[in-house]
Design a protein with these regions (language model features):
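Catalytic core of DAGKc-family lipid kinases
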Residues: 5-8, 35-38, 75-192
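Short, contiguous clusters of charged residues that form electrostatic/catalytic patches at enzyme active sites
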Residues: 42, 64-67, 113, 159
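Gly/Ser-rich catalytic serine loop of serine hydrolases
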Residues: 62-63, 88
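Short, intrinsically disordered, charge-balanced linker/junction segments flanking boundaries
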Residues: 196-199
Length: 199
């Protein structure tokens, strides 16, 4: 019987993460699962120090949950097996690595090392799928704001049109590829991908 700390995001999958946790329990009946709501964790360093010896971690959420975990724990992640149980609405990362829906959690340690990074306003971020810079990033940000208000379904086409016509202003960007720095002014769109899925 193995011990697993299941870090779950209750907002993942448009709020369906609780159902996915029940699926996980039935998939791993012979193991000991300890569930922790990621939204309640304020100090990952202290949280990891309190983990039972020999325990592994399962991240239960979507692409955003995984991305947030990786950035919040960049320099303090424990030396243990880290698994991923996709329970988001898109699960692009899971598709990229061939994880099947309803299958047991997949070991992801090899995928989360040496991730690409982006620096925005002086703050560095790692990403596991891709990032949207420009109107794409603007639309995602506005969509997240609307989703947070709970005003129904988010219409990204309307957000993009309003952004292009009235709100979004192109900005400058410095992009470094293979050690070579490139500077661009009035950038409208600069997506950067590590994964295969965009959208």
């Amino acid at each position: 019987m193995d011990n697993f700390i299941v870090l779950y995001n209750p907002l993942a999958g448009n709020g369906t993460a609780q159902d996915k946790m029940r699926e996980l329990e039935s998939l791993m009946q012979g193991d000991r699962l300890y569930f922790s709501n990621m939204l309640d964790i304020r100090d990952y360093g202290a949280f990891f120090n309190d983990m039972p010896d020999g325990a592994s971690i399962i991240i239960c959420g979507g692409d955003g949950t995984l991305n947030r975990f990786l950035n919040d724990t960049e320099d303090i992640r424990p030396d243990c097996d880290i698994y991923y149980y996709p329970s988001g609405s898109g699960n692009d990362f899971a598709r990229d690595i061939g994880a099947e829906r309803g299958a047991p959690p997949v070991l992801i340690n090899r995928y989360i090392e040496r991730l690409p990074k982006i620096c925005v306003n002086g703050k560095e971020h790692r990403f596991i799928n891709g990032i949207g810079y420009g109107i794409d990033g603007y639309c995602c940000e506005k969509g997240d704001e609307l989703r947070g208000k709970g005003d129904g379904e988010v219409n990204y086409t309307a957000i993009a049109i309003k952004g292009l016509l009235f709100h979004y202003k192109p900005t400058g960007a410095t992009i470094t590829v293979d050690g070579v720095e490139h500077r661009f002014e009035k950038v409208w769109l600069a997506p950067t991908m590590i994964g295969r899925c965009y959208g």
